A protein has these predicted regions:
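Hydrophobic packing within well-folded, soluble alpha/beta domains
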Residues: 66-75, 87, 105, 122
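Short secondary-structure junctions
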Residues: 77-84
Length: 148
């Protein structure tokens, strides 16, 4: 994919890898307060971004809809079946090595216990706690949408 980038007022054509992913914004009512919502976050345990936090999800496979990909990824990563709700937003983010398109969906748990099969750690965060972890840059872009 060819992307046009504007830098210092000049147009530069740059070949950049494009990765399209889906992210689950799994939410529930707080266990301590039935009036407050919590959002599930996971911590990476590998690679360049080890120890950074993200919303669970992953890459879409050929022929999958975003909803199908999200259900598959959460089952693979967390052994949990989810209901995929509305599309909250799509984040476009330029990492140094690639451009990321991340489709973010509100989700709820149908069954399963959110077992960490690929992640280092996980936390349920209230809206006030969202800034208490170090988010991957693209995921950090999503935080403003969750504070409303």
């Amino acid at each position: 994919m060819t992307l046009w980038m504007i830098s210092n007022g000049q147009h530069n054509m740059e070949q950049r890898k494009h990765i399209e992913v889906v992210a689950a914004i799994i939410h529930r009512l707080s266990q301590s307060s039935s009036k407050e919502e919590e959002i599930f976050a996971t911590q990476r345990g590998y690679g360049e971004w080890k120890d950074w936090w993200e919303f669970p999800g992953g890459k879409m496979e050929s022929g999958e809809t975003p909803e199908e990909a999200l259900k598959r990824e959460i089952l693979e990563e967390l052994a949990t079946e989810i209901e995929v709700g509305k599309l909250l937003t799509t984040v476009e983010y330029d990492y140094p090595q690639f451009h990321l398109t991340m489709h973010c969906y509100l989700c709820t748990i149908i069954s399963g216990g959110l077992s960490l099969l690929e992640h280092e750690a996980a936390r349920w965060l209230t809206k006030d706690e969202l800034n208490s972890v170090k988010w991957l840059p693209a995921d950090a872009e999503l935080i403003s949408h969750l504070r409303v």
